[in-house]
């Protein structure tokens, strides 16, 4: 899987960072999924190779505006771009009427079916290649993380089973390799039953706002990538006297180290952290604080940067 960050700022945008939105891209590169949709997300998409027609589903972690205010505009643009296939949006139930009323009040017609599903009732959402589940987090309002797990990644024919069942090599194998149903000796054979993954499935967790990283203990162990907010550093919290429902870089890093997370991606940075080395506090203070507690592969997400999770298990920036 790949990750492409469309917004990494907390609360408000900055000149360098937009508010929260993250694209999760299938290993095939054909389709993608959007986690959160802060204001301006559709404009950020124009600076990427992602097409809104290839968007499989949208997942909203919680109700705060920096995570959802871009949704009506994105949906309207999807309609104007010619999208016709249905689109499922998994989001807090309280936002359903807000989305629908916004579209109606603005006289927006969608030429595709919009399916709004309550995140509170989500057990598992599935496509042909991914399963998505949730983990409950802690914030000032209900918030969740989304766990993306591959289904049968890079499938190959189960030759041992084919030979054992006496299915001859040739055109039948070619059809089964495509996942098609074929007839052999009067029996119907489902191609998917004869495919097996050629590598272990990847698991990526993309979190909403959260002030208790330990809530991720059950799902983070063994995960390939954890994407988690690091809104503040400890120094800021000590000065302001509270986290306001957010985590510090140190808290997340300590948790990731204890859980054995191989790739930790920090995002959702307070607007106070600067990219300009001449200004303070600099974003490197977030990195330095995390590195003091975490020995794995650490990434500070950057807007419009794409990251690839390779077969070696490492998440690295793509060219």
Swiss-Prot record:
EC number, as in UniProt: 3.1.26.11
UniProt keywords, alphabetically: Endonuclease, Hydrolase, Metal-binding, Nuclease, tRNA processing, Zinc
Cofactor(s) the protein needs: Zn(2+)
Membrane-spanning ranges: none
Enzyme class: hydrolase
Cofactor info, note text: Binds 2 Zn(2+) ions.
CDD domains: RNaseZ_ZiPD-like_MBL-fold (cd07717)
Active site, renumbered: 66
Its biological purpose: Zinc phosphodiesterase, which displays some tRNA 3'-processing endonuclease activity. Probably involved in tRNA maturation, by removing a 3'-trailer from precursor tRNA.
Oligomer status and interactors: Homodimer.
Name this protein carries in UniProt: Ribonuclease Z
Organism (species): Pseudomonas putida (strain ATCC 700007 / DSM 6899 / JCM 31910 / BCRC 17059 / LMG 24140 / F1)
């Amino acid at each position: 899987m790949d990750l492409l960050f469309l917004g990494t700022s907390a609360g408000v945008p900055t000149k360098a960072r937009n508010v929260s939105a993250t694209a999760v891209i299938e290993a095939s590169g054909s389709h993608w999924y959007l986690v959160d949709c802060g204001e301006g997300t559709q404009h950020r998409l124009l600076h990427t190779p992602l097409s809104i027609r290839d968007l499989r589903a949208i997942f909203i972690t919680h109700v705060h505006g920096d995570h959802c205010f871009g949704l009506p505009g994105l949906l309207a643009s999807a309609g104007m771009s010619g999208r016709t296939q249905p689109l499922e949006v998994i989001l807090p139930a309280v936002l359903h009427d807000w989305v629908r009323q916004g579209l109606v009040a603005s006289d927006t017609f969608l030429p595709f079916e919009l399916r709004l599903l309550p995140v509170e009732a989500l057990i598992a959402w599935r496509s042909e290649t991914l399963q998505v589940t949730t983990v409950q987090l802690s914030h000032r309002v209900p918030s969740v993380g989304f766990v993306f797990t591959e289904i049968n990644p890079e499938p190959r024919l189960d030759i041992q089973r084919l030979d054992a069942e006496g299915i001859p090599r040739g055109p039948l194998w070619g059809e089964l390799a495509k996942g098609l149903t074929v007839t052999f000796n009067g029996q119907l054979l489902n191609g998917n039953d004869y495919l097996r993954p050629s590598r272990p499935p990847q698991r990526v967790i993309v979190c909403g706002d959260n002030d208790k990283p330990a809530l991720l203990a059950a799902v983070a162990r063994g995960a390939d990538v954890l994407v988690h907010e690091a809104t503040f550093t400890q120094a800021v919290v000590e000065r302001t006297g509270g986290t306001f429902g957010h985590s510090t870089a140190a808290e997340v890093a300590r948790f990731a180290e204890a859980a054995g997370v191989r790739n930790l991606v920090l995002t959702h940075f307070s607007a106070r952290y600067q990219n300009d080395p001449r200004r303070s506090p600099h974003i490197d203070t977030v990195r330095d604080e995390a590195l003091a507690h975490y020995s794995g592969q650490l990434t500070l997400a950057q807007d419009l940067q794409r990251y690839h999770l390779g077969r070696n298990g490492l998440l690295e920036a793509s060219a």
